Amino acid sequence: GWRWRSDAPIQSLPHMTSSQAVTFMMVEEHLKHLLPPSLISEMNPWFDLAKRSLSTQNNVRQWINRVRIVPATQPVIPPLVERQAQQSIYEGLLQDKQIECIYRSRGHLGEEKSYILNPLGLVQKGAIIYLICTRLDKSDVQTFALHRFKSATVLDTRAMHPVDFDIDSYIDSGALGFRVDFSKPTENIELKLIMHEDDAQYFTESQLSKNQKVEALNDQLYQISAVVPFTSQLVWWLRSFGKKLVRIEPVEVFNAVHEIES
């Protein structure tokens, strides 16, 4: 791709406002790994221009040094992603083409299999990026972790899309929270938690769902109720509260949190 000359006077370059420059720098910092190489190549000159535009604006430049995004859970180092495979996957998604790949399954054996995939979307969850797709031999929507791709090639054939697929609806269904029972689809449950008043305060600030209710049972205990997907992620999250949870309903969620065989 092309770049602005490093010695070009700032006056000769296209004008970029302070807010535009900050936005480009934030995009480069936080979203660059989610963009296909062809778009990055086109945007690199604008990233350069943003840096140069802010070089003379100390107060705005300091904004970049004063804003950070930190994970809500234990931070981990992102797994290594095979660069060529990542580039092909991104280009396949961008061009709406099928991808032929070799993918390593999870587990210590790490069995490698070949697939032809129809890319539908990308989702970053924590340190891991997932490709949402369907396989040529199966119609159900699946997730493939990017770091487990050994290789990938963009095919000339057009990707096939499920008729009713919507990435936001897919995420809202709890699919990326991962199923508690892989033999069954994710289901919504009416979760009820009983906690002491101080602990329940958390849910008045950050709701589990739009239909969440927080009710006082007595002077000390509160009940939080909400309809949420029953996923492994929900189970892990509830475990993090430890003894703060006086009661959990329904019983299948209680059993999963406490690892009780049902």
How would you describe each model-predicted region?
Residues 1, 98, 128, 218-225:
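A generic structural signal for beta-strand entry/edge sites
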Residues 1-7:
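Minor-groove-contacting beta-hairpin "wing" of winged helix-turn-helix DNA-binding domains
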Residues 8-16, 221-227:
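A ubiquitous short alpha-helical element
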Residues 12-104:
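Bulky hydrophobic/aromatic content
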Residues 68-192:
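Core beta-strand-centered patch of the WYL/Sm-like small regulatory domain
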